[in-house]
Amino acid sequence: MQVIDINNNELVVQYSKKNNISLAIIGPENPLANGVVDMLGEAGIQAVGPTKEMAKIEASKSFARDLLLEYNIPACPKYKVFKSTEGVKAFLTDLGEGFVVKYDGLAGGKGVKVSGDHLNSHEEAMKYCDEIIQKGGKFVVEEKLVGEEFSLMSFSDGKTLIHMPAIQDHKRALDGDLGPNTG
């Protein structure tokens, strides 16, 4: 049973004050991207989770890629950000058959489509780009990287930085990395 709408920051703060909550642990991506940690902090309630500014690295694929490029981090694939289909076909041709199309926002783990897995042609990629545009979004087209994906979460209080063990998120519905992404 959901007590309140966790995507409404004001309701979260009101509920926390009313119930004398002194520490909130925020997990879902939407409230983090909406700045609930910031608002709880302003209300004097401690919260575990990134601020709205820090959550941008998860909430925006283009922000994350631009950050890698800005700081010369060698893990950045060749990419471009688009708001329309202008230039997409030419960039897909440049990338060849190894490409990825990513919705530039939160999509519950379902905004990324990879060539060979979800997209079997440049035409299918263009259709997905059109779907994103129809919803008013922008998107990233990038070269497909091959290898093991992992997540590394780190925690900081502003002075100390502690890394958790690297983990893998197996999103596919079926064994053997098959089936649709589950989010």
Locations of regions flagged by a protein language model:
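ATP-binding N-terminal substructure of ATP-dependent carboxylate-amine bond-forming enzymes
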Residues: 1-53
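Glycine-rich phosphate-binding loop signature in dinucleotide/nucleotide-binding domains
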Residues: 16-21, 94-95, 134-135
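Short, well-ordered alpha-helical microsegments
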Residues: 32-34, 88, 149-150
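A conserved helix-loop-beta module that forms one wall/lid of the active-site cleft
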Residues: 45-111, 116
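Conserved ATP-binding module of the ATP-grasp superfamily
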Residues: 66, 74-77, 96-101, 115-151, ...
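Short beta-strand-to-turn element immediately C-terminal to the catalytic PLP-Schiff-base lysine
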Residues: 82, 112-118, 154-157, 164-165
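Phosphate-binding core of ATP-grasp and ATP-grasp-like enzymes
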Residues: 132-136, 146-182
